[in-house]
From Swiss-Prot:
UniProt family annotation: Belongs to the azoreductase type 1 family.
Cofactor details (free text): Binds 1 FMN per subunit.
List of residues binding FMN: S10
Subunit structure: Homodimer.
HAMAP family linked to this entry: Azoreductase_type1 (MF_01216)
Function comment: Quinone reductase that provides resistance to thiol-specific stress caused by electrophilic quinones.
EC code: 1.6.5.-, 1.7.1.17
Cofactor(s) needed for function: FMN
Enzyme class: oxidoreductase
Name of protein: FMN-dependent NADH:quinone oxidoreductase
Organism of derivation: Paraburkholderia phymatum (strain DSM 17167 / CIP 108236 / LMG 21445 / STM815)
Reaction(s) catalysed (UniProt annotation): 2 a quinone + NADH + H(+) = 2 a 1,4-benzosemiquinone + NAD(+); N,N-dimethyl-1,4-phenylenediamine + anthranilate + 2 NAD(+) = 2-(4-dimethylaminophenyl)diazenylbenzoate + 2 NADH + 2 H(+)
Length: 198
């Protein structure tokens, strides 16, 4: 059975275009994969703490030497990793904030990027250990940045996901959402065309 993991990373609890479009894409993928199981990870509702001394200490302390607090921190990270590893398809709702990703998504990435678990270093450099997944990134944007130096989100996500082994990544953009009603309508229509073709 196909498992679809949808990761919502907007700071908004309601009305986020990236989340709404990610929902539509997940529904489309369910139609294409009858019986698919959907798991939703909402990074707004289930907020993760930013990296600090305690979290780094938990990650870099050998399992048998961790305190109870460190074990709880590591267990949260490992549960997120297991959820990701179990997915066949990953849908990431990723609004463009200040030319990058949300802090919610960055913190999630910090919790799943674990040496020896999701990547490792070998004689030829790093090797991603999260393989065999199709990833869709749905990016909602107030302006138009794709293909310009203002879009640092796309190369960052491509690099990070590829570092973990996820190299089959497709981007769906809804750009110009804050550039007037006509531009917003055109942006959503274009995104929905891409979703229909996914």
């Amino acid at each position: 059975m196909t498992t679809i993991l949808q990761i919502n990373s907007s700071a908004r609890s309601q009305g986020a275009q990236s989340t709404l479009l990610a929902n539509e894409l997940t529904a489309k993928l369910q139609q294409s994969n009858p019986g698919a199981q959907v798991v939703v990870r909402n990074l707004h509702e289930d907020a993760l703490p930013h990296l600090d001394d305690a979290i780094l200490g938990a990650f870099f302390t050998p399992a048998e030497q961790r305190t109870a607090e460190q074990q709880a921190i590591a267990a949260r990270s490992e549960a997120l990793i297991a959820e990701l590893q179990a997915a066949d398809i990953v849908v990431i709702g990723a609004p463009l904030y200040n030319f990058g990703i949300s802090s919610q998504l960055k913190t999630y990435f910090d919790f799943i990027a674990r040496a020896g678990i999701t990547f490792k270093y070998g004689a030829n450099g790093p090797e991603g250990l999260v393989k065999g997944k199709k990833v869709f990134v749905v990016s909602a944007r107030g302006g138009k940045y794709a293909g310009t130096p203002g879009d640092s989100q796309t190369p960052y996500l491509t690099t990070f996901l590829g570092f973990l082994g996820m190299t089959d990544v497709s981007f769906i953009y809804a750009e110009g959402l804050n550039m007037g009603p006509d531009a917003a309508s055109a942006a959503l229509a274009g995104a929905r065309e891409a979703i229909a073709a996914a």
